Structure formats: C-alpha cells, structure tokens
Amino acid sequence: MRAERLSRLQGVYAIVDGGSTATPLALVAAFLEGGARVVQLRLKDAPAGDLFRIAVESVALCRVRGALLLVNDRPDVARCAAADGVHLGQDDLPPAAAREILGPDAIVGISTHSDAEIDAAKAAGADYVGFGPVFATRSKGKSPLPPPQGIAGLRRAVERASPLPVVAIGGITVATVAEVARAGARCAAAIAELCAAPDPATRTREMARAFVGDGHAR
C-alpha cells in the first residue's frame, strides 16, 4: 500500500496552515477542488482533539478525490485518523519512530535544507524529502530558515535525494512552479500562495496546470 500511496505523491502539495482566516476544512475542500494531489495539515497550535477531528474529516474529503492526506508532526493523530502519512521536521520524531506508530503502509516525509540532512533522511528510511526554501518565503516557522536555495540548489537536491522523491517548498508561486517541475521535483508545496489567495481553489488550479505545463506532465 505504501508504494501505491507514493505513486500518488505528485503535483501540487497544498499545506493547510493555522494562520489562515479560512477554516482548515474549507481550505482542504478548496485545494481538492483546484486539483491538489496532496494535502498536509500543518496546524501546530491546534489541540490534539481538534486536530484529530479535522484530520478525520479531511481524510474523508481526500478519499473522494483520490488525494493524499498527511499530518504535520503528529504520527499519533495521523494513525488515529487513518491519514496516509506524516510529515516531520528536523526536530520532530525520527522517521523510524514515526513508522513504529504508523505502521509499514504509511508515508513518512521529512523536511531538509542541506546535503547532510538529505543524506540523513535517506539513511533513516524516509519515503520522501521536502527541500527548501527554494525561493524567499512569506510563511514563518518557529526556527529561522536558511537562505533561498534557488532552482540550481533544488536541482542538486533532487540528484542527491534520488531515488527518493523531492517535495520542493518555499516561496513557490504560480509564476515559478513550472521551473520547480522542470528541476525534477515530484511535488511543489505551497502555503501562503494558496492559503492567502482570494480564491484558493482557483489559485490551486492555476498552480496545478502550470506544474504540468511545458511538457512536464507526470
């Protein structure tokens, strides 16, 4: 089942962030309507009970569309909600520990920002690596991010991570997503570009079309 799930890890990877004015479920529905193939719940300040309820409903929405639902940081919530997997940061549980909670069929991804972190993710058994920031980003995390890596840095990361797929993140917009696809990223992740859009469904659709443009259909 994990291989089948990984085969669907492609295209627009929409991240639902707690800083949006829209409700998480409204954003999930909009992203799916726009053609997102992967949705991540990144609700770091949500109480566990609230996150679980949102995850359960999000899983149901994603199943209808054939999309993947991943939970940020919380393999326990991901397992209880029957999500497709989890995305981990550098300071979260190691991939092996997350997989003990989730079981063998779930996807485990991890954020990376350097060659050393990519190598460590591969050695730890991650299923994919998130890499960035590719461009300057409007989204803020708890830890300071390294400087933008650019398309050249992304291309190097794709080569370094192989055979693991790479999810590019950081400042990616409709205008730049085709470059990201051509650099070899399996997915283009976005937070502010989608969550802050006046019409998130339309913006997601534009990004999905641009990702597969220029002969880069997947």
Per-segment meaning from a language model:
Residues 1-92, 100-128, 146-152, 156, ...:
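Conserved N-terminal beta1-alpha1 strand-loop-helix module at the mouth
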Residues 93-95, 138:
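A short, polar/charged loop-to-alpha-helix boundary motif
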Residues 139-143:
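Glycine/threonine-rich flexible loop motifs
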